[in-house]
Every structure is written in structure tokens, then in C-alpha cells.
Amino acid sequence: MTASDIQPTEPHTPPTPHADTRLVDRTKLSKMYQHYVEVKDKYPHALLLYRVGDFFETFFQDAVTVARELELVLTSKHGGEVGRVAMTGVPHHAWERYTTQLVEKGYAVVICDQVEDASEAVGLVRREVTRILTPGTLLEEGMLKSSRNNYLAAVVITSNHWGLAYADISTGEFLTTQDSDLERLTQELMRLQPSEVLVPTNAPDLGTLLRPGETSPHLPECLPPSFCYSLRSQQPFSQAEARSTLLQRFKVRSLEGLGCDHLPLAVRAAGGLLEYVEDTQKAGQVSLQRLRTYTITDYLIVDNQTRRNLEITQTVRDGTFHGSLLWALDKTSTAMGSRALRRWLLQPLLDIKGISSRQDTIQELVTNTRLRQDLRHLLRQIYDLERLTGRASSGTANARDLVALADSLSRLPELANLVIDAHSPFLKALQKVPPILEELAQKIHAHLVESPPLHLKEGGLIRPGVNPLLDERKATVEADHQWIANLEVDERARTGIPLLKVGFNETFGYYISISRAKADQVPANYIRKQTLKNEERYITPELKEREARILTARDDLHKLEYEVFVTLREEVGEQAEAIRHLSRAVAAADVLCGLAELAVYQGYCRPEMVNGREIAIIDGRHPVVEQSLPAGFFVPNSTQLGSNEETHQLPDLIILTGPNASGKSCYLRQVGLIQLMAQIGSFVPAKSARLGICDRIFTRVGAVDDLATGQSTFMVEMNETANILNHATSRSLVLLDEIGRGTATFDGLSIAWAVAEYIATEIRSRTIFATHYHELNELAGMLPNVANYQVTVKELPDQIIFLHQVQPGGADKSYGIEAGRLAGLPTVVIQRAKQVMGQIEKHSKIAMGLQNLD
């Protein structure tokens, strides 16, 4: 036979592991995999993590997804008669880290944990779903941002009305509202930035979690695409079932006390949301605060465009916290205070009484330096009471959480003593510490060791003297450990091997370790168990017999410790409402204390809030830009707006002109931010301020193409302008920058003129209109409630100096060519631009046309 007679054979390759449960004969799966598939069938749109020993494993198609998203190795396991199935897994002690990544990517994750000891199981270890994690239902500290709420929202929409409910299950906050304006629904969602929005539907793919940008024909068109939506069954959102859910949860006979009895859509949204929360939190009931009802128009409305343009929570350029208004104002000492400040900024007040109450507190803290400093010192020692309580009430808190909670509760009596002579209701609220919370803190400290381990079922949690039976078991375990120590000493003496050691690991249990060089001295009764590079490991019958007793005693001890801890945790959960009530008081005091600190060090004034339309700011400053510059570098400017019977001489509309890069946009934002700060109760960056309440702040500052909807820069600008003209009132503040610049000069000027004229004559909102159309200065001579202001410059023979000062009068130049020169345009381009500008100015017909306007 020659080599050419030999037929080549295919190389052996193992069969591809199964990755699709639909293609598998389930009767041929082993029992564990059959159970896995049964659980998976109940949650087809979630990723299932299934506890197997020390790992959470996932199989079939979920294994492929998890391996891809987490960049893990995709492997396989024997699944019974079907052969191998796709598998990947993560260590059980690190499940939070991996699950966080999956949830951040928009996945729902189901945790199926072992609920009995594997050593005691008869047959298959019993497993149950203990948690369903979705973007809006997170509780774990490592999964949440401490400085902001993690909202779950639910919406119910009919032809002419909508209901909205939202909750942060980590803090217990739970609110609902109802309205008829769909634009307000969009703005509320943009304000809340919920991590997940529940939408009732008859869709066949119920349970689907739509990640941001994903669409579904079952999703109402009015909902913005930037959120994660969960399609839910309509049944929990029905009027009858939602009402029943709320009545049962809050143990009331009527919804009247919750303020939503007359709001059917608000009830449906709240009931559906509550049912979803209870369904996802399998291990324990989340403690939500009593449902509160609110009305959107009870607060200053700040739409998404204004939040963006004023950079309230993040910058426009790169979306960062640093450089935002929140960054400039946040001098809080606690996570609760930081979240509260964010909420205040996104929902300013309209009520002068409420604003004044906050101002009074700041005034008291500004005046009383010692109180402010001592208060801030104590607040820094308080942990996140809201979220610690949330984890305790839901059964997810560990021992370190309870110790942190007790440490914080122990500080509350000190806070109460500190504010004993305070006058402000916000500070007096800190005096009301229920004795039961002091007792609870003492009990936690008496039960738990000072620095408990992270894991609850490995012992070392409970102090001696707490439980007699526990002390007995500890003594037994300690005696066993002493027996092991004595064995090591005795065996060293008996064998003559001085480096003999008795060790332990979870795989082999107890063993005797001897270096390989001393192997010839090993006694005959030693049984070799393992050979390593430099040592041999042995066991003896006596050691293995004792090991069984030791491990049983250890496990009994750990179980009892865990039971004692769970009882203590449940006691904490029973006081959740009392703790949260105090935590809200701490958060408010923290915000006001931080604002007082800011007022002192930045030289802020207390604004006078009035019911009229006046906006009178003397030497105002931009709160963010000022902090970004060296002290004293910011140029302050005043603002006078808002005519009424008392201030009829003040204009309703200011035409603001001036050079490029002179500070017009900064001035616009400055006025808006000062008004916003005043309406959250803060002091403001100015020498003095007298401010009428605004019902809404509108801004139109800058524009970019909206590629998602195919809108040009100019069309975006026109849409935003139309929104302002259709919704602004005489009590609104409107800040407009460069209306009409996105089209031809004549078109742009005409639109800008008409918009300014309409606002001044029809709406009469307080408005600053920044423009390079100097022709708009003519409006001041035609309309009595319009005034011209300019940002001044100093002209030198070869350059201009920006003075950044806003003064009465209209500018007649934009100095755009000079700005181009400063930016580095070639000299030849600058010279040519001057020639062209001279010709255009000589032959312009715009001025002549304006003279003929009616």
C-alpha cells in the first residue's frame, strides 16, 4: 500500500454545544437543566443567572449573550443525554459587579439562588427566583449613584389625558400625577430621567425591555426614545386592580387620603408600578413611602431645552457634572442632601412662603457661623440613611449596612442638641428623634461586632452575650480550633518534624502538611491526600473524624448567627418610615447648610421675592463662571425687567447687542440661573435682587442639527421658538439668543423682528433678546416696553478690548471680523472681509425698509 492509497480523514471536532432551548429535547436534559429551562420559560426576556455551588451560571442562549456582553469565556457543560450545552458563569461573591454591567447595558437579570444547604439536600438542590433586577429596581449600593435618584416610572395614556407615577425603591420615594398636556408628560420624564419606564400594552412580547433608542409599534409615539421601556400587561394597570393594589399596600379603605381618588390615570399608573415592584423583589417587601400626589403646574416648569441651555445638571459641551450649576451649588455633606439639591433644582417653587422659609434657614445659618460649621461637621458623619433603610426593609442589607445605619442614627441626638435653640422649622425638624430609633441604634451596636464581615453566612457577625445558644456554639467551635492547634504541637513532637503544619481548605478539609524533604519521617498512620511541588499533604482517620464534628459545629454556628442577624434586620425594617422621615429632614437641612456655606464664601445676597413681574438684579454674577475664574475677575452686571403698576418704567423686553465673544450668552444664562436659584430658596450671586415669581423659564440658546428626526439647525431653532411663543405667559422669563441666524439675512431679520414684536405686544413675558441684528434696536423707539442694552468694548487703533459690561444703548457693530482675526484667520482673508463689508454697508437696503414698517 502506498501513501496515495490512504484516504484523508476529517479531524475530530467535538459537537457544538446547544445554545437554543427551542432545539433541545427537554426530556433528555438532566434534572438541573430541566429546572433551569422551566424557570427560563417564565422569564423569556430576561437573562437568568442560576446558582450552582460557588458560581452563578447561565446556559443556552443566555450564556452566549452574557459571555459576549461581559467578555467572558463561553464554555460548555454536560447537560444529560442531549450532550453539552453552552455555559458561562461568574463567582457568586462577585455577582453584583457583573450584574451591574448587564443592567447598565439595558438587560433585566433574574437571580435563581439556592434556598437550601446543598449538604442537606435530598436529590436536586432547591432553587428559587430571589431577585429580578431591572434598571429601575436596583437596591445594591454598588449599582447606584449616590448623588442621584434611580427612578422607576409608569405611564398610562388615553386619548386626551395621561397618568404618571414614579418611585425610587432605594429611597422609598413614591409620587403620582395626572394631566392633559402630552408635552408636559415628555418634560416630566426628561426632568426625572427614569432608568426604566413601564408601559401597559396588549403587545404579544410582554416583558420586553426596550433599551434606549429601540422602538416598538406598541410604544406610544409621544414617549421620548431616550429611555428604557418595559412593556407590561394591562391588567395590573386596570382601574379596579390598581386601586385594589394601593388600598391593600397602604392599608386604607379609600384613596382620598392619598390625594388621588379623583385622578383615575394617576391611580392606574401608581398601582401598576407598585405591582411591578412587588413582583421583582422576591426576597422581601420594599418599603415605599406613603404615596403622594402632586400637580406639575405647582412648580416652576423648566423644560429639557432650558435645563440643557442653562447647564443645570451637566454641561452642554461634554455632558459632565463639573461646570454645571449643580456642581457650583453642591456643598452638601451627605448623599441624601446631594440628591435633594438635584431635585430642588429641577423642580423650583412658585410659593413665596415656601421660598421664604428656605431663605430664613439659610439666613440663620449665615448669621450663626458656629452652628453652621458644627452642623456640617456632624452631617459628614451620617451615611445614606435612605438607602441603608431601603436595603434593610427589602432584606438585602448586610451587617456593615446595619452598623453604618446605627452609627448614623447615633448622630441624630447630637444633631438635635445642636439645633436646640434654632428658629427655622427646617432645623427644628432635626430635634424630633423618636426614642425608639436611639434604642434601635444601641441594639444594633450591642448585637453586631464593630467591623463585621461582608458576607452574612460565614460567621463573625454577632458579639458575645447576645444569645446564650450562640455563645455555646461559639465555645464549641473555639474548643475545636484549640484541638487543631494542640494536634499540630503534638504531631510535631511525635514525628520530630518542626515545620509540620495542620491546614484547611474548602476542597480537602483539614490536612497535615509536611515538606517533601521530610517525607521519610512520615508516620505509618498518615494517608497521603495530595502531592504539591514542595510539600505532601496527609490525613489521619482521627483528623477526618474530628473534621466532621468541627464543620458541623461551624455550620450550625453560622446558621444561628444568620438567624439572629435577620431578626435584627427585620426590626430595622419595621422602623423604615420613622427613619426615612428623619432622613428627609437631614437632607433638607444639609442642602440649606451647604447653600449657606456657599452664600458666605461667594458673597451671595438674599433676594427679595415678590408677587409682581419685576426682575431687578444689581451687580449680578454668573454662579458657575465666577467659580471658574480667579477671585474678582468676573465683571458683574445689572438687570432691570418687568413692567407693572409699580415698575412701569422697567422694560418687558431687552434687545441686547454687542460683539461676538463679548459675553451676551453668558449674561442671558446668568439672569436665568439667578432666577432659578432664587426660586429654590437659595441666596444669589448679586449685590441685591428683587425678583417676581416666574411660572416658567424658556431659553433658545444655540442650536445643532437633529439628525435623528432629519431636522436642520434652522428647523430646530424654529421649533424651539414656536414652543416658546405658544406656551410663554406674562409671568414667564424668556431668554433668546440669535433668533433667525440659521437662514438668509433678510429672512432671519424679519423673523427675529416679528418674534420680538409679538413677545413685547402680545405675551409681555420678561424677555432678553440677544442679537446681531442691530436693526432690532429700532423696536425701542416704536414700543414703550422695549429697551436697548449693549455689551461694551473699548476700541484701540489695532484691536478691541472686551469690557463685558452691559449698559443702556444699542451697539451698531458686531466686530465679527475682529473676532476672526483673534481666532487666527489669514490676513488676506481679514482684509478682503473688510472690503466686502464696506460695500455691503454702502448699498444695504435694510434700514430703508425698516423705516416703512407700520
Curated annotation (Swiss-Prot):
Family annotation (Pfam families): MutS_I (PF01624), MutS_II (PF05188), MutS_III (PF05192), MutS_IV (PF05190), MutS_V (PF00488)
PROSITE patterns named among the record's database cross-references: DNA_MISMATCH_REPAIR_2 (PS00486)
SMART domains: MUTSac, MUTSd
Gene Ontology MF, one: ATP-dependent DNA damage sensor activity
BP GO annotations: mismatch repair
CC per GO annotation: cytosol
Assigned keywords, A-Z: ATP-binding, DNA damage, DNA repair, DNA-binding, Nucleotide-binding
Region (Disordered): 1-21
Binding residues for ATP: G658, P659, N660, A661, S662, G663, K664, S665
Classification via Gene3D superfamilies: 1.10.1420.10, DNA repair protein MutS, domain I (3.40.1170.10), MutS, connector domain (3.30.420.110), P-loop containing nucleotide triphosphate hydrolases (3.40.50.300)
Family to which the UniProt record says this protein belongs: Belongs to the DNA mismatch repair MutS family.
NCBIfam families to which the protein is assigned, alphabetical: mutS1 (TIGR01070), PRK05399.1 (NF003810)
Function: This protein is involved in the repair of mismatches in DNA. It is possible that it carries out the mismatch recognition step. This protein has a weak ATPase activity.
Protein name: DNA mismatch repair protein MutS
Source organism of the structure: Trichormus variabilis (strain ATCC 29413 / PCC 7937)
Organism taxonomic ancestry: Bacteria, Bacillati, Cyanobacteriota, Cyanophyceae, Nostocales
